[in-house]
Amino acid sequence: MYQDKILVRQLGLQPYEPISQAMHEFTDTRDESTLDEIWLVEHYPVFTQGQAGKAEHILMPGDIPVIQSDRGGQVTYHGPGQQVMYVLLNLKRRKLGVRELVTLLEQTVVNTLAELGIEAHPRADAPGVYVGEKKICSLGLRIRRGCSFHGLALNVNMDLSPFLRINPCGYAGMEMAKISQWKPEATTNNIAPRLLENILALLNNPDFEYITA
């Protein structure tokens, strides 16, 4: 019988492509008895272009590589100091719709930021989480065979300047924010556990096993 347990992998700082490939392989080979997983990772600097991404939103990538991704959404930037959380969930088994998962991920971030005294909100017209008009978290998902992969990217204490080389998520002039603007002591090391605790709470607190790479 299936046990509701989630494997949480802390992968540290990794290049984007091998992690993306591993995520695809996991999703393609999982079956009904495969446990869901959550991967916590930071990436070396990279622009990722979403499945429907338009080239004109990549303004001047310079020395940062641009990699095509099959997630939803337009172009975004990943770099050290940004906490990425990939959610590899069997949505059918969890009786979660795609829209419900997006809402759950946005609420995870809103709740995490509220604990830090930062008031944040989602926007109906542009997925993600915002503080005022500034975007602090990007979302992009893909569903295959009833299972989700990709996830969210929360700006913690990263260098935001590479976002100026793109129209983030397809919005010209979209300003970005990071947690350390309000909480200078914030690091991915102290934000990741809060993020994890909040998503597990919204998934009804399943058992979990924490695995470090």
Curated annotation (Swiss-Prot):
**An individual GO BP term:** protein modification process
**Entry's localization field:** Cytoplasm
Binding-site residues, substrate: R71, G72, G73, Q74, V75, T76, Y77, H78, S138, L139, G140, G151, L152, A153
Q: What is its main location?
A: cytoplasm
Indicate whether Transferase appears among the record's keywords: yes
Cytoplasm as UniProt keyword: yes
UniProt keywords, alphabetically: Acyltransferase, Cytoplasm, Transferase
By its UniProt entry, which InterPro entries does this protein fall under? aa-tRNA-synth_II/BPL/LPL, BPL_LPL_catalytic, Octanoyltransferase, Octanoyltransferase_CS
Membrane-spanning regions, if any? none
Catalysed reaction(s)?
octanoyl-[ACP] + L-lysyl-[protein] = N(6)-octanoyl-L-lysyl-[protein] + holo-[ACP] + H(+)
Cellular component terms per the entry's GO annotation: cytoplasm
Q: What is its EC number?
A: 2.3.1.181
In this protein, the active site sits at: C169
Q: Which residues form the BPL/LPL catalytic domain?
A: 32-207
The pathway where this protein functions is: Protein modification; protein lipoylation via endogenous pathway; protein N(6)-(lipoyl)lysine from octanoyl-[acyl-carrier-protein]: step 1/2
Which CDD domains does this entry report, sorted A to Z?
A: LipB (cd16444)
Q: Which GO terms describe its molecular function?
A: lipoyl(octanoyl) transferase activity
NCBIfam families documented for this protein: lipB, PRK14342.1
Instruction: Recite the other comments.
Output: In the reaction, the free carboxyl group of octanoic acid is attached via an amide linkage to the epsilon-amino group of a specific lysine residue of lipoyl domains of lipoate-dependent enzymes.
What HAMAP family does this protein map onto? LipB (MF_00013)
What family name appears in the similarity comment?
Belongs to the LipB family.
Q: What is this protein called?
A: Octanoyltransferase
